Structure formats: C-alpha cells, structure tokens
Regions:
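Short, charged helix-capping/linker segments at alpha-helix termini
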Residues: 2-21, 148-150
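Structural recognition of an alpha-helix C-terminal capping motif at a helix-to-coil junction
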Residues: 3, 17-24, 37-49
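Sigma70-family region 2
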Residues: 7-10, 21-38, 57-59
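Helix-turn-helix DNA-binding motif, specifically the short coil turn and the N-cap/start of the second
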Residues: 11, 113, 122-127
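Arg/Lys-rich amphipathic alpha helix in sigma70-family domain 2
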Residues: 31-35, 45-65, 82, 134
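Internal acidic/polar
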Residues: 53, 61-86, 113, 158-160
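C-terminal edge and immediately downstream basic/flexible tail or linker adjoining helix-turn-helix-like DNA-binding
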Residues: 63, 119-120, 136-163
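A short pre-motif secondary-structure segment
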Residues: 103-107
Length: 163
C-alpha cells in the first residue's frame, strides 16, 4: 500500500503520512467491510481516497490542475523493452504535475473510470479525460527527452490502461 501512496505523494515522508492516515481509517471502518469483494481491494480503495483527500486538503491537486511499481501499466515491448526502463517510466510519472499524475494513476493504474475520477476529485468528467490525455502526452515527451522511449514513426498507443 505504500507504493499506492507513493504514486500520489510528493516524497516518501508524505507517502508514509498518507499510508498511516489511511490505515487509521481502515481500522476505524473495519466493521463496515461486508466480505463483498477482496479485502485488499477494500483497503486499497480507502487508501486511494485518503491520498486524494490529502491532496485536496493541502491544495496540491487544485494548484497543479490549473497549470496546464507500475503494476497495471502495460508497455509495448517493441517500444520499451526492459524492466529497468519500466522502473524509469515510474520515476518519470512522478515528474508529472500532481493533477496529471493523479488522473493518470487513478485511470491507467488503479482502473477507475473518468466518471469515478471526476466524482472523487470534484472535477468534470471531460477534465479528467483531458488531464489523462495531457498526462500521456507529457509523459511521452519526458520519456523521449530522457531517451527511454524512441520517437515513434507513427502515432502509437504505448501506454494502455489494464482493465
């Protein structure tokens, strides 16, 4: 779960704070778990919501939204062939502005729909879609600049959300 928090946090200390706050919520809400679905999924949902609430509370999300462990991410082998590069991609995702990073994480990695993201972040569904598109574009530019990804000859979708 620390990896989940780390994707949303600015640094390890913030991630640890989010995780601690999330587990406090998990333990205080334990009586509400109804054995419908996986226990880990229930915990993950609480942790993700805790991270989102933390970003909102600290106004980090809204500020960056105004400016323009990668599990769940599939990278096409012909574009990015190595595990080392996959780790580099995760680090490049952390470079994205928090708004872009948050939407990218929620949609492509956590598997939320744009409607769910819009509800969680109090934004329009179209904003979620555009933030996701911009995040992918910015991430691709960063990866090309860092020579992790070669510029494709034709438009390809190399980052695909796993559903």
């Amino acid at each position: 779960m620390l990896a989940v928090c780390y994707r949303f946090a600015h640094n390890r200390e913030d991630a640890e704070d989010m995780l601690q706050e999330g587990f406090i919520k998990v333990f205080s809400q334990m009586h509400t778990f109804q054995n419908k679905g996986a226990f880990e999924g229930w915990i993950r949902r609480i942790i993700v919501h805790t991270c989102i609430n933390n970003l909102k509370k600290n106004k980090r999300f809204n500020e960056s939204l105004d400016i323009v462990h990668a599990h769940g991410v599939q990278v096409r082998e012909e574009s990015v062939p190595s595990i080392v590069q996959a780790k580099q991609i995760v680090e490049c995702i952390r470079i994205l502005p928090i708004g872009y990073r948050t939407v990218l994480n929620l949609y492509a990695i956590e598997g939320y729909s744009h409607k769910e993201i819009a509800d969680m972040l109090d934004i329009e569904e179209s904003t979620s879609r555009s933030q996701y598109t911009r995040a992918k574009q910015m991430l691709e530019e960063i990866l090309i600049r860092k020579k992790i990804l070669t510029k494709p000859k034709e438009k390809t979708e190399w980052l695909v959300a796993v559903r």
